[in-house]
């Protein structure tokens, strides 16, 4: 019997791409409205219904991101502040799954440095669904031998860390990023600490500092450029020591 060549012209099981949205529920006032918008936007952009995964106090995002990867989604969006972004990035680092950022937090440092929409869920989601991919750097840190964690923007010790840790959620909800300034005032009189920094195996001279920062990017809220030389894709971190005088 003579066989005829077969040419495949289509596939019946092709599916629309799927986005998972790992969101911090404390950053949304009306969960019903934004979830409705998420479904509508995905439909308009040719995507399937989104997979919505809420973070919790016990799991601020890593478990939800692993579930999204397990379900083989095409994109994972972090919807929240820099904390949610960091948790999602920790899991996605080194994978082939791209990450989108919907900046709904207080500082939104990474979103600002990538020139992404801030405090606009609809625009942020559309940008993520339509946007081009870009590779950025991540920093990794461990404390006292604990498991490494990634940071996407800036990590600090001393004055900076005290300020971040002691800014209340209520203050951030009411005043936005200005709440960090209010919290910082109580630590301005701290005498600082003595630190020795080692960079690429070279030990720098010990110095007294109020805060030491490692920066993957340099743009802060209100357009403040803390570290003008910092670039998010230059394969290096910029260090900054703030002296107590």
Q: At which residue positions do the language-model features occur?
A:
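Glycine-rich beta-strand-to-loop/alpha-helix junction loops that act as flexible
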Residues: 25, 79-81, 102-105, 216
